[in-house]
Amino acid sequence: MAEDRFPGWHGTTILAVRRGGEVVVAGDGQVSLGQTVIKGTARKVRRLSPGGHEVVAGFAGSTADAFTLLERLEKKLEAAPGQLARACVELAKDWRMDKYLRNLEAMLIVTDGETLLVLTGAGDVLEPEHDVTAIGSGGNFALAAARGLMATDLPAEEIARKAMAIAADICVYTNGNLTVERISK
């Protein structure tokens, strides 16, 4: 019953595709509250440059929680410049141990153009097996489409755009207004 009185924020599909020496991270722009679209142009994919080392991050879940995690990730990257995996593991440790952070409801996809990682709400750090990963409400649709498109000769950005379009056609919490960031090592 409480869910009916306080509907949750829904939405977001974030997809990352690694191919040909680059990683493309794409995210849709829809933010929904219950059955209502609140915003269609949110930017859920960001470029970070802590210590001069470029990183692209996409987030799903609570926006405030995601920004908290992005800020902490930037601090971890400043402490370990150029060591994305180490910074993510340190963030995951904090996420699991800190009383406040444990309650954050967000997931991140992060990449430096070489390493591609997913940070889950449980404090896990996962490296995708097939050079493709996705999170959010339409994540499974985008992931399936992108994995199918990996069998083609399409470049990473085109795979990401086509897969996100498929996810937007299927998931009511995902739209076709994309933010796309490319990064290579």
Swiss-Prot record:
Na(+) binds at residues 168, 171, 174. It comes from the Bacteria. It is found in: Cytoplasm. Its EC number is 3.4.25.2. Keywords: Allosteric enzyme, Cytoplasm, Hydrolase, Metal-binding, Protease, Sodium, Threonine protease. It catalyses: ATP-dependent cleavage of peptide bonds with broad specificity. One of its GO terms (cellular component) is proteasome core complex. It is an enzyme of class 3 (hydrolase). Allosterically activated by HslU binding. One of its GO terms (biological process) is proteolysis involved in protein catabolic process. Disulfide bonds: none annotated. Signal peptide: none annotated. The keyword Nucleotidyltransferase does not apply. Belongs to the peptidase T1B family. HslV subfamily. A double ring-shaped homohexamer of HslV is capped on each side by a ring-shaped HslU homohexamer. The assembly of the HslU/HslV complex is dependent on binding of ATP. This is ATP-dependent protease subunit HslV.
